[in-house]
Amino acid sequence: MRKRHAKKRHGGVNWLFIVCLLVVIGGSGYLIKTFFFTRDSQVSQESKVVLEEDRRSDNYANLTKEIVAPDSGELDQKIQETNYIGSALIIKDDQVLVNKGYGFANFEKQQANTPNTRFQIGSIQKSFTTTLILKAIEEGKLTLDTKLATFYPQIQGAEDITISDMLNMTSGLKLSAMPNNIVTDEEIIQFVKQNTIQVNKGKYNYSPVNFVLLAGMLEKMYQRTYQELFNNLYHKTAGLKNFGFYETLLEQPNNSTSYKWTEDNSYNQVLSIPAASFAHEFGTGNVDMTTGDLYWYLHQLTSGHLVSTALLQKLWTSSQQSSYHGGIY
């Protein structure tokens, strides 16, 4: 279980959301994300300027097509000049300025990145798991003060660890060993129950095991798999359409191949990630999606369409010991 992070900042008066998903490196989708809310590249690609007036970011269709706004050619050019490889979505004042792919998703097949290329989102998935937990809180299944012992009493210190502690990474939980040859959710939960210890409770310590346990709690509460819960909320309710779990990524025509970064962006070192490595990331980092779907999720979340903004604010102000709250800094 690797450490992969997202960051939360507040300020400004308009939406400004920038998502840049790099070609997957070492099994981690690296995401650079900045959002404010109070309300080749080696592929020769001509910018397709969308002249239509409807570039609103609250229209999901606009997140699936290539867009370079008439006044955003310089932004597009700057991205190309960096030899950036991946997909970029830039939104300002609820208008899509740039939504475009750069470089190759698969160099051997000469398959270019597009707005519909899917990338591993890494630890951003922790925010999705958090929202599922908050949804359960709204449904009265638990609270931020519910103790870990309610679900996993055998874990060291469980009687003093709250859901809030786990979401804020202040539980003190960590693995005493790393799993090998584990490929199912049940196996990783069993391993975690047997190999989790507690150190320095109350202090921030980034440990993905918190979210493995939270995913396990969700399955216990609903008697449904984590993937079923994920699909029900984010596909059926939120309307995400271009995402999936690691088991099906390679089957998708719009998936991205992993490459090791090189100075010349030569695409000459393909990285093969064992399925077991992703299986270990249960609830913490084994989902792939497009930049558009990631934006759509965050837009729905911060607009109060998934859980109440009051509950979000309660979580985000629940700890003075940590700047990390439920998958976002």
Where do the protein language model's features map onto the residues?
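A short, well-structured edge-of-sheet supersecondary motif
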Residues: 78-110, 327-329
